[in-house]
């Protein structure tokens, strides 16, 4: 029976890829036995309740092998992956896109494809489960109690982010993380002996992982035994499973020819004969469906039913905790944050927005028990520390400060995994210039619709002495170009509070907070509520103004000072604070016209960064005071003056406009 089911997985993959004339059959054919063993013997999921929060998680880090996952989901009974959807693999509007997409297909626990990120994301799942278990489980009531499983390939393990995450997972002793390594000695360009020769198991042992070797990737009992041993090890686990890529293909197995191209009609026929598969394309024997129903769907449904009874009993035994748990199960924060939670701020108060962020962050932490995060070894520079808590580790699982170490990329992907798990609000910080190290993770936050908050400090050339390696220039423009990402660069402490509020209230959009090291003065015109619009009028000295200054962050202070100088010269000026271009762009046309009336063409945008995205607001007849070169090393006042960020220079720029 098991051999028939394994071959059903293989041929669903082969047939769908042939029909699409696109895809990666090799991993489907080689990894089918380990995937079958995992799904039918270990994985606890309920296809009728795909979002069950206590289900085991499965991450196909080798996302190019997506038909392996779709075949498993189809056979297990997930409604989203019908046979018609399998036949529509890689087609417009299908539930079976080329790489798995979270939120698009029920049963897909994470978007994967960029290699390495799946392993790192799984680390976040495991850490989320551990925190929620520590916080809410009580004796006899293991409400949060599941494993996170991964199938990865050689390419995943070559990527640096998997190494960062593996080092971190070993440090944290995340013992409910089990990685199955599809070790087939082949990559796209040829054999791994030409590009990847270290002992992976030795490396993972050094990280503090349990490791094992299954020498025959078709030995279902050996695979099952290795997984059971891993679960009892008390460590994160890597199981190397030696497989043959394209297993069963007489002329292509064991070669890179089967990695990323359909088998084609002739080789498919030969493979059918070699594996004894006497069925038409997309024909699956009834006994295969029965196998998956008994060993995946029914087993999972029984586990779900037992868990729901456990939750009901938990409500009786622990009613106060149960209220929070119920909210988490429903996908809500256990406590609602409100604007009134933030203290009022006096005009004229001066503080660096990184410090304002620390104050706001701690307001959030005091209100939300499931709010946690950390920094890439910069917590006391990014000001990301929750003051009431210590560091989280295996011995202190309830603490909410996470020390990610100098692992920016892993930090971003771990945060994604924690957000994907559900039940948590998470954040992570580093210097803004180092956002490049984790930009791929930020992109996947946005693609997956995850409300992760990124705290990026030291936001401009005002860093000064550290020089151009530490002074962001192109970073704002680059992040603003990512769809479904809200970038906030607040002007003062008041706007910083509001930006944090917007971040925590977000449901499907990640947030980037771009913050200063230098002090900024709270302006009289800044407004907590209006930050929700992305831009608003912060200063105006005449109703019939003929000049608009648009600024973000620290430059709002500069723009207001310049506007007051222009007013003293008889100028009629409006200053617009635009903490988030992304949010402003989402407003309706009437609001945009209210803030930036089309009739007023005399406009200057002011921001210490690349100028390219500002011309959409000032037009070709306006001007931008920005920076399109790298920064410099000198005391901050000198650097700012040399780059023209002075009241005198801005006033002159405005006066030179027609």
Residue map of PLM features:
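A glycine-rich helix N-cap at a beta->alpha junction
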Residues: 78-88, 170-182, 205-209, 446-461, ...
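Cofactor-binding active-site loop characterized by glycine-rich and histidine/acidic residues
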Residues: 30-171, 385-386, 414, 418, ...
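Conserved acidic/glycine
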Residues: 1-32, 151-152, 156-157, 178, ...
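Short glycine-enriched loops at secondary-structure junctions
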Residues: 89-95, 375-381, 388, 406-409, ...
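A short, small-residue-rich loop immediately preceding and capping a beta-strand
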Residues: 20, 56-57, 108-111, 141-159, ...
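Thiamine diphosphate
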Residues: 91-103, 127, 131-134, 140-145, ...
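Flexible, small-/acidic-enriched active-site or ligand-binding loops
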Residues: 470-473
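Short, surface-exposed connector motifs at secondary-structure boundaries
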Residues: 51, 147-148, 208-211, 342, ...
